[in-house]
Amino acid sequence: MFACAKLACTPALIRAGSRVAYRPISASVLSRPETRTGEGCTVFNGTQNGVSQLIQREFQTTAVNRDIDTAAKFIGAGAATVGVAGSGAGIGTVFGSLIIGYARNPSLKQQLFSYAILGFALSEAMGLFCLMVAFLILFAM
């Protein structure tokens, strides 16, 4: 219905409805008595019909939708950057375990160190992946 209303709209109707588009939707609807015509379209004081009300509603809700989308981007990016802190905790755990393992069995120094480097690389990769997702949410969407 909305697509049909956008196609049936004339430029004169848009100009007539643009004066009211600056008012909040509640003030525009409540301040005019509504009457029904025979064709089923709504007329407000003989100058506006349902099509101009749809145009007005679209004009006023796009700013709200844009603000909601921006807030959702920031919330998602903030949640994704929590993974970077998890990466730091993982690196600390890996090297803490390396020190404990070396204290228990010093003869396994080379094998423990290679496992620690592998754990460091995996933990750092996950942190960088979380940071990349945060930047993608902010700048690519």
Swiss-Prot record:
PTM sites of type N6,N6,N6-trimethyllysine: K109
Site (Reversibly protonated during proton transport): E124
Entry membrane topology: Multi-pass membrane protein
Record: transit peptide: 1-66
Reported modifications of this chain: Trimethylated by ATPSCKMT at Lys-109. Methylation is required for proper incorporation of the C subunit into the ATP synthase complex and mitochondrial respiration.
Molecular functions per Gene Ontology: lipid binding; proton transmembrane transporter activity
Keywords attached to this entry: CF(0), Hydrogen ion transport, Ion transport, Lipid-binding, Membrane, Methylation, Mitochondrion, Transit peptide, Transmembrane, Transmembrane helix, Transport
InterPro entries with a match to the protein in the record: ATP_synth_F0_csu, ATP_synth_F0_csu_DDCD_BS, ATP_synth_F0_csu_sf, ATPase_proteolipid_c-like_dom, F/V-ATP_Csub_sf
Entry GO terms, CC: mitochondrial membrane; mitochondrion; proton-transporting ATP synthase complex; proton-transporting two-sector ATPase complex, proton-transporting domain
A GO BP annotation: proton motive force-driven ATP synthesis
HAMAP family, A to Z: ATP_synth_c_bact
Further details from the record: There are three genes which encode the mitochondrial ATP synthase proteolipid and they specify precursors with different import sequences but identical mature proteins.
Function field: Mitochondrial membrane ATP synthase (F(1)F(0) ATP synthase or Complex V) produces ATP from ADP in the presence of a proton gradient across the membrane which is generated by electron transport complexes of the respiratory chain. F-type ATPases consist of two structural domains, F(1) - containing the extramembraneous catalytic core and F(0) - containing the membrane proton channel, linked together by a central stalk and a peripheral stalk. During catalysis, ATP synthesis in the catalytic domain of F(1) is coupled via a rotary mechanism of the central stalk subunits to proton translocation.
Family: Belongs to the ATPase C chain family.
Subunit organization: F-type ATPases have 2 components, CF(1) - the catalytic core - and CF(0) - the membrane proton channel. CF(1) has five subunits: alpha(3), beta(3), gamma(1), delta(1), epsilon(1). CF(0) has three main subunits: a, b and c. Interacts with TMEM70 and TMEM242.
Protein name in UniProt: ATP synthase F(0) complex subunit C3, mitochondrial
Organism lineage: Eukaryota, Metazoa, Chordata, Craniata, Vertebrata
